[in-house]
Amino acid sequence: MRAMRFLPVFVALLLLTSCLAVMSCGDEAGGGGPAIGDIGAFQSALEADGFTVQEGKLETFDVIAMYNAGLIPSCYGNNAQAPYMCYKLPVAPGQTTNNTVSDSPIKPENAGLWADYRLRPDEAIVFIGMTPPECSYFSYCNYIAVRYYPDEGQARRVFGSLGDPLNNMTIGTEGTPNGEEGDVFGQNTVIICTADKGIDGRVRDSLASAGYSMDIVNTDVIPPGLVKMGLDAEDDTFILLHRLAFFTDEQAGEDYMASEQGTVFRLTPGGDTQLEPFEVPELRVRGTGDTAELDLLGALQELHQAILDKYGNLRATELKTSIWLLQGYDAIQTGTDALGDNNDTVYLRSDNFTLSDNPQEFLIVYGVNHTAIGKYSYNNFSIYGADIMNGIAGRENVTLAGSAEEYLPDNPAAQYLYACKVARDSGGDPNIVEIPTGPGAYGIPLDVQAFLGYRIYLEKETKTGPFWFELLYDRVIKFSPQ
């Protein structure tokens, strides 16, 4: 009798505990309950709506290894310090034309999957998974990869972005519903890539029916007016890049990069689709008009002179800095190679140079440590071979901090500047960036021309790349024996 008397109380307490646990989980995910649904139910809903569902992958794209294996023609100006991931997809139902890039020769488990892919105008790609662990920057961005030019009778790489990326300041996740401020790292998200409004709506309906909150669903538009969609050899190919930079916990970052992320579906509708093409999306506007960084020009000139004074016994060659890449829409119109550009940064570069293994021949890279100003997410430089565009080494804002104070010990502006030595042999000095000669694309041979590329990422106020002319350009001096 006593046990029966306490049973309702026990059940009530159990129910209350369960409710509190659910509420707590919902609060941690951004308030309003779990936003993630059931993938199996989502797939069933898609198939009930007539879609053919094929599974792909989101995993690492090792540019240097791909080049060394002869699978790609260059390294595309890769950011030496920031890894890449990409979708790897099967061909569409009925597609008979191969795509152009697959890593299956070095990863046999990826046989039948392609890093670039052709798409029908009514198809979609869906990613369901977690954002990366805490880092300085991440994004997801669609590109036109290869375009056929009938006047030339050949296909050429364009590698131009198709709009603004979904980045860590704009993406909708459980921690940042609808892109609001919050905890964006290690959060559930959904990304739909498609060119068609109707298909986007049908995919969202299937997601909703499977329990997914629209607060975490993002549509990354492929603008059909700028591309040629279809499955034939003369149609464009596409690629999605997932960029990541400078993990707070390096081991967590390595674990993320080493594993296949989330679930990727290629969705192909059955029957005839009445197309409802998206317009070209608006771009976020670069620049705020804040030119405070330009006030550091005097201090930068003092740093320049201090560097020359320190190495006054050597010959100094000033290497000019210029704008390296513009944006994907420029490349699409002009038929030039944008090298996988990203609207969230600016790209600057130095003149070409060669660097011998003479200990008296080296570079001093210097400039404003742009992130120290407080406007940007990160900045870095990379060293490239000019022939194959292989980024092999570099430095970023955290390790550059304080490096100018050696030259300007009494100037308070030195905290906003940097100076870094680059040489063939560092002699074990961690403050010197070493340029190896190989093996393969992991180095730059002594007789091959090289250059420096500079990036400044993601202005916090605009959530896009900086405006070039609000910056003081990074600089480099080559020193060599007299």
PLM region descriptions:
Residues V9-L20:
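Hydrophobic helical h-region of N-terminal Sec-dependent signal peptides
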Residues S18-I39:
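Bacterial Sec-dependent N-terminal signal peptides
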